[in-house]
């Protein structure tokens, strides 16, 4: 009986690994990602952060890449995306900016932005 359980566990793990890899590849080519450009020294960013965190709680499946423009690598990526102000939220698919939202916007505006993207 133990051998059967071990075999099922091994097959189950392999199946999960294969499905996870297949699902990740499919998701990464079709899904958008959210990129949040900010700076801790930006007053607007500090005001906006609680609003962003509140709205993101409604979208637990959404992962957000955070770019702090005080870090050189993050600044380069933010500039590549076209950031002109902080805070800015980009929707990026396959490296291409699909949409962006700039500034310390109201919670209703941010929620509407996320609803359009989901």
Curated annotation (Swiss-Prot):
SUPFAM superfamilies: Thioredoxin-like. GO terms for molecular function: oxidoreductase activity. Its main location: secreted. Disulfide bonds join 42-45. It comes from the Bacteria. It holds the Pfam family Thioredoxin. Residues 1-27 form the signal peptide. The keyword Nucleus does not apply. InterPro entries: Thioredoxin-like_sf, Thioredoxin_domain. Stimulates the oxidation and reduction of disulfide bonds in vitro. Belongs to the thioredoxin family. This is Disulfide bond formation protein. It comes from Brevibacillus choshinensis. The lineage of its organism: Bacteria, Bacillati, Bacillota, Bacilli, Bacillales.
């Amino acid at each position: 009986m133990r051998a059967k359980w071990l075999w099922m566990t091994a097959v189950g793990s392999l199946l999960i690994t294969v499905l996870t890899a297949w699902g990740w590849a499919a998701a990464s080519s079709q899904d958008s990602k959210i990129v949040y450009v900010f700076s801790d020294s930006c007053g607007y960013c500090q005001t906006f952060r609680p609003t962003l965190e509140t709205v993101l709680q409604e979208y637990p499946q959404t992962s957000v890449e955070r770019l702090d423009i005080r870090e050189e690598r993050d600044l380069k990526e933010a500039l590549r995306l076209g950031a002109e102000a902080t805070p800015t939220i980009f929707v990026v698919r396959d490296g291409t900016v699909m949409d962006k939202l700039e500034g310390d916007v109201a919670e209703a505006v941010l929620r509407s932005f996320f609803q359009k993207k989901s």
